[in-house]
Amino acid sequence: MWNYEKRLEYPIKIKNPNPALAKFIISQYGGPDGELGASLRYLSQRYSMPYRNVAGVLTDIATEELAHLEMVATIVHQLTRDMTMEEIEKAGFQTYFVDHTAGVYPQAAAGFPFDALCLASKGDAITDLSEDMAADGATA
């Protein structure tokens, strides 16, 4: 099915914690327009495609989105590891820290947990592909 390489698609090496920045980037992980939703969208919609090659393209895209998810998680992890209490308080990171410490949790920047309501899978190829283009900001 997949061949997982134990390395990131692009190396990420953040040396200094920055929980204030992590608060914003976490939305790309689990927010309404984030990589988690994108990967689930494509993996779910592939089954409504009438042609195997189109379903294969959606699987390829979903796999790429999962690679993005891994990179965003790595960024958040590196921005929040080894934080001091002073950094946590200064960044306003306490509410996240109370529930997740420095764990990477899928949520929007506003603190709302990931919700699958941000994606659609209608079982109709045209509807699903139109939703994909809208979600990715493409124009037809």
Residue ranges and their predicted role:
Residues M1-A140:
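Non-heme di-metal
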